[in-house]
């Protein structure tokens, strides 16, 4: 405030040809180099306006208000020495070669700028102050008029102690910022708002217009002639926002932790100005020390037209160890700074644990050296040094900077166990024949087979007798597991459900209650080696074999009565005549059936009751059984008996589940009448229908045409042959008729049906 009261006119803008330059490290031409020399000692010596030379009258005057400052004498008072300058080296006519050499070395003038400016600068420094002032007036005649009214002619009114009473090293008040955080040699400098220059270059006559265009400020609002525009500059030092030492990287010499920086540094206590393009002291302005300036416009974006960005060797020289970082070196110890120093959790740092939190797992890490008990070896099979997992042995490493990123990934080595010399998992398996298709022995199986499995019965039969234990041999010719078709006799003795032996299902085998039992049952029926599948099986052996052969045709019959009725068909003998119409028939059964038509009685009705309730059929009535059979073979008749077929299928599945739950044997074949003739289309009548109309069991389906019945068959000859049905017996292809019932063998005449 004292400087503002003494120089009230300093707030005005300078002449159009001159712009006030602030604290800049840019080596300008002759005029700006002298400005920077004065500004270097500004915070320690004087408060004159930037860019002004001392007048000769002021330089020779001896009546200063401050008696410690005498420019003509070499004696410096103690107060002047405390400011760090000597009058002989600064204001005397003697060339200050040492000062020039130090200042010239501190500036790195790039080769792109004219080197002819340096001799001009050095030659002018060797002249006395008065000659320099005259030379300055000859070179720039307009500058004397611009700055002549800025200095007071009375030299006694300059009170330098009053101006710099708060920034001297001997002052009682501390500066606004910590001097240890600054890299600039001007440690105690305070920038006045009128002394801070704008970002535009000055129009010096010693700079060519081409250089002015090249090194102009990159600001979007800057023009070469706009020097009268006044810019707003806030009242704080540029070191608080541009000093690299106040960045987030700590050094080992300043503060040990983040709390000291955040608590003691004044740069983090105040408000920072937002980035601006027109402010010189904005935090967005790049620093000349910052070589990592992210700009895609080249070096023309630098704030100084004559100084390229350069590194600060004290801070940015291999600060983070990026220059020495390689991906191939996994165990490299980085000497830079890490976010681990920060009290805040970094999202880029992997979680780490100390030694006291890590469990002592033998397969994951090495045991601690001071364990109370010996650690068991990692080698499970006694192979030596190699275990199941090849991990590093040793103590847990302490938590270090970047320790999580330096850990090598664990490697897993899979080693197969050596072959066991001692059988530890039960008896060894017998050598099986690879050519056989038999299942494995039941001794190694944990669960038994289902009841419909044909292999389940022989596996349990060896428990009852020692003589059948040899059946486990897969090469035995009489084994039930053999695929030979000639071992059915041995199968009957072991797996016949009708044998005298105890039921194999009552043994100590666990039964399966799977939901696909019907599938196993169907597969068992399709097995040609299943019990009862062979015609030589005791269950399927006919009690009356077809031993009566016809000498005129290949038909065979079980009874002599049936053979005689058949021979009448060849001789066309019809001894049985109808009493109503006189129609003759070869069989007694055919005449009785024909006489029923004359009476009008139709006792064959397509209707019946279901076991679960309800009725089936269409209700049509037929006088003959063959007419009802033809009806069932038609499309309408198939729809009529479909409820019976569905009910029978459900009953079969229910009975199969009951067998498995109650350890019962498989049921015998369902009472059906399968038709083996290919012309019949495998027509099968339900068992309930056959039980309701037993006459349907004796029908010769191969001789019944699949057409509508003809009720006018009274006078004509019957379409049947002379046999009554019972006399034909069982042929080779009619073996399915034997499973209907046993009533057919008891009839000696056809009249017993009625």
From Swiss-Prot:
One of its GO terms (cellular component) is nucleus. Transcription factor involved in the regulation of calcium ion homeostasis. Regulates genes encoding calcium transporters, transcription factors and genes that could be directly or indirectly involved in calcium metabolism. Supports especially pmcA, pmcB and pmcC expression encoding for calcium-translocating P-type ATPases. Binds target promoters at motif A[GT][CG]CA[AC][AG]. Plays an essential role germination, radial growth, and asexual development. Also plays a major role in proper chitin and glucan incorporation into the cell wall. A zinc finger (C2H2-type) spans 548-570, 576-598, 604-635. Residues 30-44, 130-140, 189-209, 459-472, 491-515 have a biased composition (Low complexity). It comes from the Eukaryota. It comes from Aspergillus fumigatus (strain ATCC MYA-4609 / CBS 101355 / FGSC A1100 / Af293). Residues 1-51, 63-150, 187-227, 269-299, 384-543, 708-737 are annotated as: Disordered. Residues 63-80, 94-114, 141-150, 210-227, 279-293 have a biased composition (Polar residues). This is C2H2 finger domain transcription factor crzA. The keyword Metal-binding applies. GO terms for biological process: cellular response to calcium ion; conidium formation; positive regulation of transcription by RNA polymerase II; regulation of DNA-templated transcription; spore germination; unidimensional cell growth. Disruption phenotype: Leads to reduced levels of beta-1,3-glucan in the cell wall and impairs pathogenicity in an experimental murine model of invasive pulmonary aspergillosis. Increases sensitivity to heat shock. Keywords: Cytoplasm, Metal-binding, Nucleus, Repeat, Transcription, Transcription regulation, Virulence, Zinc, Zinc-finger. One of its GO terms (molecular function) is RNA polymerase II cis-regulatory region sequence-specific DNA binding. It is found in: Nucleus; Cytoplasm. The keyword Chloroplast does not apply. Gene3D superfamilies: Classic Zinc Finger.
């Amino acid at each position: 405030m004292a400087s503002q009261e003494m120089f009230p006119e300093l707030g005005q803008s300078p002449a159009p040809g001159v712009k006030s330059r602030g604290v800049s490290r840019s080596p300008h031409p002759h005029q700006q180099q002298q400005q920077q020399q004065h500004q270097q000692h500004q915070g320690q010596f004087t408060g004159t306006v930037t860019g002004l030379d001392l007048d000769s009258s002021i330089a020779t005057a001896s009546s200063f208000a401050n008696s410690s400052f005498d420019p003509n004498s070499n004696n410096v008072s103690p107060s002047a020495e405390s400011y760090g300058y000597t009058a002989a080296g600064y204001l005397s006519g003697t060339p200050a070669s040492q000062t020039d050499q130090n200042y010239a070395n501190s500036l790195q003038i790039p080769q792109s700028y004219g080197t002819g400016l340096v001799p001009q600068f050095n030659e002018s420094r060797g002249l006395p102050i008065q000659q320099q002032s005259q030379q300055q007036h000859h070179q720039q005649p307009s500058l004397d008029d611009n700055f002549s009214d800025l200095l007071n002619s009375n030299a006694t009114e300059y009170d330098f102690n009053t101006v710099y009473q708060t920034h001297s090293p001997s002052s009682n008040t501390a500066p606004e910022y910590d001097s240890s955080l600054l890299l600039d040699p001007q440690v105690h400098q305070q920038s006045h708002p009128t002394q801070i220059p704008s970002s535009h270059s000055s129009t010096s006559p010693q700079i060519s217009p081409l250089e002015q265009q090249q090194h102009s400020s990159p600001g979007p609002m800057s023009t070469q002639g706009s020097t009268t525009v006044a810019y707003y500059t806030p009242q704080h030092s540029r070191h608080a926002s541009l000093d690299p030492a106040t960045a987030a990287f700590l050094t080992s010499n300043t503060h040990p932790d983040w709390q000291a920086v955040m608590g003691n540094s004044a740069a983090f206590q105040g408000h920072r100005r937002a980035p601006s393009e027109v402010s010189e002291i904005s935090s967005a302005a790049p620093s000349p020390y910052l070589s990592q300036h992210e700009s895609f416009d080249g070096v023309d974006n630098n704030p100084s037209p004559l100084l390229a960005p350069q590194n600060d060797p004290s801070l940015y020289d291999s600060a983070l160890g990026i220059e020495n970082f390689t991906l191939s070196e996994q165990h490299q110890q980085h000497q830079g700074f890490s976010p681990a120093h920060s009290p805040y959790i970094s999202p880029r740092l992997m979680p780490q644990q100390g030694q006291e939190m890590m469990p002592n797992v033998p397969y994951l890490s090495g045991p601690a050296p001071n364990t109370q008990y010996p650690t068991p070896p990692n080698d499970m099979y006694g192979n030596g040094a190699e275990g199941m997992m090849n991990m590093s042995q040793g103590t847990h490493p302490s938590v270090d900077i970047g320790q999580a990123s330096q850990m090598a990934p664990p490697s897993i080595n899979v080693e197969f166990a050596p072959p066991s010399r001692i059988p530890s998992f039960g008896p060894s398996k017998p050598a099986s024949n690879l050519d056989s298709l038999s299942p494995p022995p039941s001794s190694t199986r944990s669960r038994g087979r289902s009841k419909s499995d044909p292999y389940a019965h022989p596996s349990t039969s060896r428990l009852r007798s020692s003589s059948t234990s040899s059946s486990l041999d897969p090469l035995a010719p009489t084994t039930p597991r053999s695929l030979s078709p000639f071992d059915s006799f041995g199968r009957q003795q072991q797996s016949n459900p009708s044998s005298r032996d105890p039921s194999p299902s009552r043994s100590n085998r666990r039964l399966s209650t799977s939901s696909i039992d019907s599938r196993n049952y169907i597969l068992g029926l399709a097995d040609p080696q299943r019990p009862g599948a062979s015609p030589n099986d005791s269950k399927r052996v006919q009690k009356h074999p077809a031993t009566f052969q016809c000498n005129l045709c290949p038909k065979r019959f079980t009874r002599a009565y049936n053979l005689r009725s058949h021979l009448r068909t060849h001789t066309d003998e019809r001894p049985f005549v109808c009493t109503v119409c006189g129609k003759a028939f070869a069989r007694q059964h055919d005449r009785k059936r024909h006489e029923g038509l004359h009476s009008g009685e139709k006792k064959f009705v397509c209707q019946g009751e279901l076991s679960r309730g309800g009725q089936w059929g269409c209700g049509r009535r037929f006088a003959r059984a063959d007419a009802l059979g033809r009806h069932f073979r038609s499309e309408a008749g198939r729809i009529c008996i479909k409820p019976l077929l569905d009910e029978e299928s459900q009953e079969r599945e229910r009975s199969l589940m009951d067998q498995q739950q109650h350890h019962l044997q498989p049921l015998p074949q369902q009472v059906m009448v399968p038709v083996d003739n290919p012309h019949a289309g495998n027509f099968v009548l339900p068992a309930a229908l056959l039980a309701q109309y037993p006459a349907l069991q004796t029908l010769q389906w191969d001789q019944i045409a699949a057409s509508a019945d003809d009720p006018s068959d009274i006078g004509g000859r019957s379409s049947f042959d002379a046999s009554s049905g019972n006399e034909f017996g069982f042929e080779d292809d009619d073996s399915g008729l034997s499973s209907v019932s046993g009533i057919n063998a008891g009839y000696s005449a056809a009249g017993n049906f009625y």
